[in-house]
A protein has these predicted regions:
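Residue-level structural signal for beta-strand termini and adjacent loop
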Residues: 123-125
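Short linear Ser/Thr-Pro motifs
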Residues: 18, 22-27, 111
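Aromatic, loop-rich ligand-recognition surfaces of beta-strand-rich domains
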Residues: 1-7, 29-32, 37-121, 130-182
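Polysaccharide-binding surfaces and accessory modules of carbohydrate-active proteins
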Residues: 10
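Low-complexity/repetitive intrinsically disordered segments
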Residues: 183-187
Length: 187
């Protein structure tokens, strides 16, 4: 879907979901709001600033208030109006010549307020081909309303460069309460 954006704060909002990338290489063309548009073709996704040479450079940001402490790496966060128990995430690379800039390793965090985070998963060794998604499973039984994906390494092993993703999908189950039945949720 289409997010309403605030370029000054790098914040995007749609139907109660709030998405915030840690940086953007080109805020007008690759701000990150297209990570949730269901399209992984060329020209759709998010590019971070130049923060990698295989692994994250010391100049890369760090997700604050994480337990255990988050590693250095560009990150994206999403806040939802409802808590879910996350079962897994799927990420796809930017398409075309950008598949080598996709996440190769990283960590997943959950939170309740968008300010404090708990590690709930990790991944490594990812490679990609055009149109391919990689899945990251989580084992947490806790329901969270906020999630973060921290990228610690990219697939490009030759050049210092930015990180790019074409699509970020989250799958889980809504918290049961107030007379509601649990339902599958996809963001």
């Amino acid at each position: 879907g289409k997010f309403e954006s605030n370029p000054t704060t790098n914040t995007f909002v749609q139907a109660g979901d709030t998405f915030i990338p840690s940086s953007s290489l080109n805020p007008s063309d690759w701000p990150g709001d297209e990570l949730f548009d269901g399209h992984i073709g060329a020209g759709s996704g998010w590019l971070s600033e130049n923060s990698y040479h295989v692994t994250a450079l010391s100049s890369a940001p760090t997700l604050p208030n994480a337990s255990p402490s988050a590693p250095i790496g560009e990150y994206v966060t999403i806040g939802m109006p409802t808590k879910i128990r996350l079962s897994h995430m799927r990420i796809a690379p930017l398409q075309g010549t950008y598949t080598t800039n996709a996440p190769a390793a990283g960590k997943i965090y959950g939170g309740l307020d968008g300010a404090n985070w708990t590690e709930i998963g990790s991944f490594s060794g990812f490679t990609y081909t055009t149109g391919q998604y990689n899945s990251i499973n989580t084992t947490s039984s806790v329901y969270y309303s906020h999630f973060a994906l921290v990228v610690t390494a990219i697939t490009n092993t030759t050049n210092g460069t930015w990180m790019g993703m074409g699509e970020w999908e989250l799958y889980g189950y809504e918290e049961v309460g107030a007379g509601d039945d649990s339902v599958d949720t996809t963001v």
